């Protein structure tokens, strides 16, 4: 009886801990990463033609089922991203025996090169979102973060990102359709003063996530296709992911400090472009930086169910 009680106690404790928000502390640094738990569920992805600002690649609206995951409460900041770029704390990586989900040597993770120019472009570093990295660099950051913490992190799929952004809403924005309220939730071209702002300074959505509209647009894992939604018409699709087969274009979501209101809608999507490297002084162009994408950043997710090692590497750009 006592054994059964203890088993039930630990099982309940595991469930309670395993499906709550938490803070990931980066070993041997002052940095931390608050993570919000997102329950799995169904939602309608995309937008109707009647939605103000609708683009053709946002339809048809279709039903999607998403598994549970955690997502960063904030966009990744320079404070954290620069640890990856400088790699000064790699000597403190977790060993395999301390790793809960991943078993990789942090020294084996490819690191982004130090850029030739100051990549914040004078807009701010402390608690400001990191910008201008390529999708590969963002994915390698996720691999590095996984090695440092022992927990598996990756970029969100486009569907996961939109599910988290909407937070149960079915409107143009996660707070509704009243565009006059956008200034309370987002930094965009009308209020940003021509630069990004510190993360978390606007209202969060109903699930507690900040800056899903505006501040910086955000990378997802998917290859961009203007017709991908048509293939999901009139059926339920579980955890959709358009696996990349080429470098460009990849899906970017959320809109930024440079964008107008329509670009900040939950359904809005755009594809990346090699033109974002146009002013890159390196020859050949850098694998790690999009010098002309001063509007672009990312946030991370951690799936509730950790994938096998082979799939982890695929998510990290191998």
Label for each model-derived stretch:
Residues 20-37:
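GGW-centered surface loops in extracellular recognition modules
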Residues 47-52, 65-175, 221-229, 302-318:
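Active-site microenvironments of metalloenzymes and redox enzymes
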Residues 186-213, 243-246:
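Short, well-ordered junction/capping motifs at the entry into regular secondary structure
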Residues 10-18:
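Hydrophobic h-region of N-terminal signal peptides that target proteins for export
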Residues 51-64, 96-97, 169-170, 192-195, ...:
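Surface-exposed recognition segments
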Residues 33, 151-152, 204-207:
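Short loop/turn microsegments at loop-to-beta-strand junctions
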Residues 2-9:
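Sec-dependent signal peptide recognition
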Residues 170-196:
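Chymotrypsin/trypsin-fold serine protease catalytic domain
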């Amino acid at each position: 009886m006592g054994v059964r009680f203890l088993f039930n106690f630990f099982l309940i404790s595991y469930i309670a801990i395993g499906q709550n928000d938490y803070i990931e502390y980066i070993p041997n640094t002052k940095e931390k990463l608050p993570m919000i738990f997102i329950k799995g569920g169904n939602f309608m992805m995309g937008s109707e033609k009647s939605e103000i600002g609708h683009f053709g690649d946002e339809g048809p609206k279709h039903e999607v089922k998403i598994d549970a995951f955690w997502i960063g409460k904030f966009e990744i900041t320079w404070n954290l991203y620069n640890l990856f770029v400088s790699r000064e704390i790699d000597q403190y990586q977790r060993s395999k025996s301390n790793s809960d989900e991943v078993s990789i040597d942090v020294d084996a993770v490819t690191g982004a090169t130090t850029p030739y120019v100051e990549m914040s472009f004078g807009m701010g570093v402390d608690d400001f979102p990191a910008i201008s990295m390529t999708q590969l660099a963002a994915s390698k950051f996720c691999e590095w973060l996984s090695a440092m913490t022992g927990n598996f992190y990756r970029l969100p799929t486009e569907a996961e990102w939109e599910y988290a952004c909407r937070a149960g809403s079915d409107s143009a924005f996660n707070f509704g359709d009243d565009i006059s309220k956008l200034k309370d939730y987002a930094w965009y071209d009308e209020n940003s003063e021509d630069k990004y702002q510190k993360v978390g300074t606007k209202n969060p959505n109903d699930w507690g996530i900040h800056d899903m509209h505006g501040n910086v647009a955000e990378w997802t894992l998917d290859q961009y296709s203007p017709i991908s939604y048509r293939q999901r018409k009139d059926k339920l699709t579980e955890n959709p992911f358009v696996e990349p087969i080429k470098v460009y274009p990849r899906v970017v979501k959320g809109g930024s400090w440079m964008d107008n209101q329509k670009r900040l809608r939950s359904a809005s999507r755009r594809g990346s472009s090699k033109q974002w490297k146009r002013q890159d002084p390196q020859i050949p162009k850098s694998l790690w930086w999009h010098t002309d994408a001063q509007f672009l950043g990312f946030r991370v997710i951690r799936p509730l169910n950790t994938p096998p090692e082979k799939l982890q590497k695929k998510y990290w750009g191998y």
